[in-house]
């Protein structure tokens, strides 16, 4: 199966693009569910979107997003350049699979989070066995994200030790780096002095 990735950059680009688009659509779907009522029981301080680059887009539920299209084009171009340099110029395919794994496995990890939120929010909206209300300050939300990503990095690390896969090693590193970033964001967060309504689309959001 890996032969297809050696022969052409297209399989890697298509895989990445499919995951990236799916990530964005899942984010918008869960953000809408959150704003439609899930936030009345599970409320997160600040934006639903953790990544600052996308927060305004997600807060506005902007499905057609120039920022997203620009990022998609840039990352696909990056993957094309990585394939050309590692496979055709340097002849070090391990580096390509490391980079591919870093991109794909962080997205796979994020998709697990999306699925968790989707089923949680669906249960809340259906009033299916979830009662009460809980609020998370943004630093707590970011620390939770960091712990989750550290855990995935460790899990991928165990798989790497058993397989020696450069693809999996890429996932170890990318999850670790994003976890560190979220931890740093939590430490830098300045608490809000104003409390916002759970139905305000511009300030309401979640993990």
Segments from the language model and where they lie:
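Hydrophobic alpha-helical segments at protein termini of multi-pass membrane proteins
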Residues: 2-207
């Amino acid at each position: 199966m890996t032969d297809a990735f050696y022969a052409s950059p297209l399989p890697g680009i298509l895989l990445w693009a499919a995951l990236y688009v799916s990530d964005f659509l899942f984010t918008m779907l869960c953000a809408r569910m959150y704003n439609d009522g899930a936030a009345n029981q599970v409320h997160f301080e600040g934006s639903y979107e953790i990544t600052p680059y996308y927060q305004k887009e997600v807060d506005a539920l902007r499905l057609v997003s120039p920022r997203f299209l620009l990022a998609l084009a840039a990352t696909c171009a990056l993957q094309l350049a990585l394939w050309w340099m590692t496979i055709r110029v340097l002849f070090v395919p391990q580096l390509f699979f490391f980079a591919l794994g870093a991109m794909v496995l962080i997205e796979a990890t994020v998709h697990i989070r999306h699925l968790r939120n989707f089923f949680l929010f669906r249960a809340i909206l259906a009033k299916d066995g979830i009662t009460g209300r809980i609020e998370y300050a943004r630093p707590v939300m970011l620390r939770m994200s960091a712990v989750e990503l550290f855990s995935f990095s460790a899990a991928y690390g165990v798989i790497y030790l058993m397989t020696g896969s450069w693809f999996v090693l890429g996932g170890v590193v990318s999850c670790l780096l994003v976890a560190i970033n979220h931890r740093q964001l939590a430490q830098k967060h300045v608490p809000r002095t104003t409390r916002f309504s759970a139905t305000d689309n511009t300030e309401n959001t979640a993990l």
